[in-house]
A protein has these predicted regions:
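Intrinsically disordered, low-complexity, mixed-charge
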Residues: 1-175
Length: 175
């Protein structure tokens, strides 16, 4: 816990890559199911933990936007994530942000938000386009829609299937 008593602001958690992310999501799913937590509450919890989306800060837009583009409370690193989804050291952050967006909005509305966010990033980061972020965000939106329909229990399977670097998936492989 930090001095303010918020366990979510501990940036000192170890970087454990994809396996750590999947394990942490599994633990949150298990806890949500055991406690009878609503899917809505689960999504809010993981969005705050992995992407620093705190709806309580919406009334302070600059702080809210700084949090979105900053380091999340819990960090895992990029190891073990599909390489075509990684453009920085926190791919779980971007992915989870769009799980959040996909949960709340239909794909037809969520996709323009993804593109708008990436266009803003393109300008902010000196004309550097991130196709990995578009891919990751698209997967996140799709997973968010699935969580909305099927509940938190579906998320670990989707993450394992779609975000993990597969053995033998290098650029020289044929399949």
């Amino acid at each position: 816990m930090t001095a303010k008593g918020n366990p979510l602001t501990n940036h000192q958690e170890s970087l454990r890559g994809f396996p750590g992310f999947l394990q942490d999501v599994n633990q949150h799913v298990d806890r949500a199911i055991a406690q009878g937590m609503s899917t809505r509450s689960f999504v809010l919890q993981i969005a705050e933990r992995y992407s620093y989306i705190r709806l309580a800060d919406l009334y302070r837009p600059l702080r809210f936007l700084r949090q979105l583009s900053g380091q999340p409370p819990v960090c895992f690193g990029a190891s073990g994530f599909r390489r075509d989804l990684v453009d920085d050291q926190e791919p779980a952050r971007h992915y989870t942000a769009f799980v959040f967006v996909g949960y709340w909005l239909p794909t037809l509305l969520a996709t323009p938000i993804l593109w708008a966010w990436e266009i803003l990033g393109f300008v902010r980061y000196g004309w550097q386009w991130s196709q990995p972020d578009i891919r990751s965000g698209t997967i996140g939106i799709r997973h968010g829609r699935c969580v909305r329909k099927q509940g938190p229990g579906v998320l670990p399977t989707l993450i394992a299937r779609d975000l993990s670097e597969k053995v033998g998936s290098g650029p020289l492989d044929n399949g």
